[in-house]
Amino acid sequence: MRKTLLAVALSVTTLSAHADYQCSVTPRDDVILSPHQVQVTGENGDLVIKPDGNLTYNGKQYSLSAAQREQAQDYQAGLRSSLPWIDDGARSRVEKGRQALDKIITEQVGASSSMHDRLTKLDAQLKTQMNRIIERRSDGLTFHYKAIDQVRADGQQLVNQAMGGILQDSINEMGAKAVLKGGGNPLQGILGSLGGLQTAIQEEWKNQEADFQKFGKDVCSRVVSLEDSRKALVSSLK
């Protein structure tokens, strides 16, 4: 159960790494998307690109060749398409994970289980964490690269806290059911029910794991491609 919830939590950090592998590129710049420009600013300097391809780098405006302008426009287009795609993809997987766990709890424990409330709370907390990395603004998106490590740590803590409550709820609720049923050993009934819940969640994780892995690799591929484009553009300015 912990592995499934943690996988959902870690989906918010797919820009840097995911699942059991590391991406070859770790973002070192914030990306600020707005209708009138794209800004990439951080450890690699400050790059601002206008919709027509005009740009400034570290405060200096450059006179671009046709090839450089095309490079700038292509890089800008890549950022404008990739950042929303990553944001939507991560959020949809968190939602899919929540719905799957919610369904399992209903089937294994019941629709009135307190675990549903804990799961809803965790879902809201994880989405708040996601917004710390890719912030949704009224006029665009901002990617905060420094938030990745902190969100990873905070996501782990949120899952651990939720796990404690969910485990306690499951013991209490299944224990009450076992007592009401009567006969046999109530403890044995509780353990059997917990085993069934764990098995159902593990099976669901197996169903979703391949999609998580593929999404992580696709994100990494886009991040690597964007970084290559940024380096090529900046190098051409020197």
Labelled PLM ranges:
Residues 190-238:
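A cross-kingdom marker for long, charged
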Residues 1-7:
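Positively charged n-region of N-terminal signal peptides that target proteins for export
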Residues 14-18:
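N-terminal signal peptide c-region/cleavage motif recognized by signal peptidases
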